[in-house]
Amino acid sequence: MELNHLVTGKIALNQYVHRLEQKDVSFYVHYWGAMTNHYNTLLHKHSFYEICYVVRGEGYYLEGDRTYPLREQTIFLSKPEHLHQIKSETGLFLFYVAFELSEDQSSAEWIKVMEEVKQSPFITMQLKDGEPPGLLWKTLMLQAAQPVNAFDKEILSHLSHALILSLIQTFLPYAQRPKQKQPIHTSSALLTEVKLHIKDNLSQPLKLTDVASHFHISGRHLSRLFAAELGVSYSEFVQNEKINKAAELLKSTNLSIKEIAEEIGFSVHYFTRVFSAKIGSSPGLFRSLYKDSKMTAFQINKPFQKIEQAKPHE
């Protein structure tokens, strides 16, 4: 992939992205840089952090009495007040960013985190293909190299903040990193998708096997999800959602009983029977009671999750 054109992204970043603020933490970015042929620097220091990413090329990073080799996918950290120097005979393609924590706008926890970074023994880290810091930096530069409008400024800001956090995490001492990844509960995420699908398609049959196939799982697995996480069967959940939708339409619209039945994928006869069993009243009576201005409450035989007590008609 040709990356030289990404260098122009630094223009937009330096124009629009300097203060990065999120809950509990704020960073000030002094400058963004990109150079396709970076050779040698003088021995120098900064009053802030500077992190560089080697996109291409080879060279050396010198700090104190140590020399660190640089090659493609190396990121290296220059800490405040540390004398350092970059050398390359053939030229390095570098992305770099200079930033510091705005302590007066950040929590004590974040001040501690940055102190841990300052004390970190890590100076250079070799990234593997596909690791977040490298991908985020290339994505940010790609986005910044495009014509920028108001919407793009928000994208640049959020991408920049994500990149800074990813870089900081990379240089934290191992002792400060979680020793084990937290388990990812994929079942809850899947169930959320299924529930949204059901609620958005109540006029459809929503058979268990069809919905399971839509989400590339077995019907048995889908049944277990509903039983384990919601304590109801799949069919009961679908029926409850349909009746809940019908009750909302009866209270808030002038649709006929037939039209409401069609909205939830039922025949009029089946809708009337199921609604009466669930609510304790026929659809017609439910509507008339709800619209009766003298009626202050409507008691249902089987209280249902979202059915509210009826209020006086205004």
UniProtKB/Swiss-Prot annotation:
The keyword GTP-binding does not apply. Pfam families: AraC_binding, HTH_18. SMART domains: HTH_ARAC. GO terms for molecular function: DNA-binding transcription factor activity; sequence-specific DNA binding. CDD domains: cupin_RmlC-like. The keyword RNA-binding does not apply. Residues 192-289 form the HTH araC/xylS-type domain. Residues 209-230, 257-279 bind DNA. Keywords: DNA-binding, Transcription, Transcription regulation. This is Uncharacterized HTH-type transcriptional regulator YfiF. The lineage of its organism: Bacteria, Bacillati, Bacillota, Bacilli, Bacillales.
